[in-house]
Amino acid sequence: MKQLLETIAKSLVDCPDEVQVSEVTGEQSIILELKVAPEDMGKVIGKQGRIAKAIRTVIKAAAVKENKRVVVEII
């Protein structure tokens, strides 16, 4: 999951070296925190949050395969 989010984010931004993904595991879910450079924040979120929503949808679909619940937070 973490690797998938990192790959997607790096393909969207201008500064792929500054992409960081951290994973926080809870009792029932996994929280993936995506950190990008401030100038790339708009590219990851997209107009009206469309790209962010698409990223979350892809990650959730991959999580369902593994019977897990994943939340993506963009920081």
Curated annotation (Swiss-Prot):
Q: Does the keyword Hydrolase apply?
A: no
In what residue span(s) does the KH domain sit?
29-75
Q: One biological process GO term for this chain? A: cell wall organization
Q: What does this protein do?
A: A probable RNA chaperone. Forms a complex with KhpB which binds to cellular RNA and controls its expression. Plays a role in peptidoglycan (PG) homeostasis and cell length regulation.
Q: How does it assemble?
A: Forms a complex with KhpB.
**Record SUPFAM superfamilies:** Prokaryotic type KH domain (KH-domain type II) (SSF54814)
Query: Which domain of life does the protein's organism represent?
Result: Bacteria
Please report the organism this UniProt entry assigns to the protein: Clostridium acetobutylicum (strain ATCC 824 / DSM 792 / JCM 1419 / IAM 19013 / LMG 5710 / NBRC 13948 / NRRL B-527 / VKM B-1787 / 2291 / W)
Q: Which gene encodes it?
A: khpA
Keywords, ordered alphabetically: Cell shape, Cell wall biogenesis/degradation, Chaperone, Cytoplasm, RNA-binding
- What is the protein's major site of localization? cytoplasm
Which Pfam families does its entry note? KH_KhpA-B
What GO CC annotations are associated with the protein? cytoplasm
The family database entries (InterPro entries) matched by this protein are listed as: KH_dom-like_a/b, KH_sf_prok-type, KhpA
Q: Does the keyword Cell wall biogenesis/degradation apply?
A: yes
Q: Which family does it belong to?
A: Belongs to the KhpA RNA-binding protein family.
Subcellular localization is given as: Cytoplasm
What's an example of a GO molecular-function annotation for this chain?
RNA binding
Protein name in UniProt: RNA-binding protein KhpA
